[in-house]
């Protein structure tokens, strides 16, 4: 199942700089691992915001929740999820 996920990160302004840097580093490593596994199919920065738009390829809504809730920055995110389905006019064979 494909899901469009918009994630906005809101780190507390008083968060220790070292903790913030560690969280960001851990998040980057985890996101790259999920991309290599094909779970996190697309990742796009939203210009001018600490936010992204992503496409996840997971088994179920519960699987998506498990993936998102394990992200190091998840406690500091506002997340919007939309289920996707293949468009009849798409020319891409890998749209599922």
UniProtKB/Swiss-Prot annotation:
One of its GO terms (molecular function) is muconolactone delta-isomerase activity. Pathway: Aromatic compound metabolism; beta-ketoadipate pathway; 5-oxo-4,5-dihydro-2-furylacetate from catechol: step 3/3. Pfam families: MIase. Keywords: Aromatic hydrocarbons catabolism, Isomerase. GO terms for biological process: beta-ketoadipate pathway. It catalyses: (S)-muconolactone = (4,5-dihydro-5-oxofuran-2-yl)-acetate. SUPFAM superfamilies: Dimeric alpha+beta barrel. Its EC number is 5.3.3.4. InterPro entries: Dimeric_a/b-barrel, MLI_dom, Muconolactone_d_Isoase. Belongs to the muconolactone Delta-isomerase family. Homodecamer. This is Muconolactone Delta-isomerase 2. It comes from Acinetobacter lwoffii.
């Amino acid at each position: 199942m494909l899901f469009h996920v918009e994630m906005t990160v809101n780190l507390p302004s008083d968060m220790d700089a070292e903790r913030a840097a560690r969280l960001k580093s851990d998040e980057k490593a985890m996101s790259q691992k999920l991309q290599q596994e094909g779970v996190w199919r697309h990742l796009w920065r939203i210009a001018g915001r600490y936010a992204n738009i992503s496409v996840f390829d997971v088994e179920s809504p519960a699987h998506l929740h498990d993936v998102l809730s394990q992200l190091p920055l998840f406690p500091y995110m506002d997340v919007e999820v939309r289920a996707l389905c293949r468009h009849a006019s798409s020319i891409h064979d890998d749209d599922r």
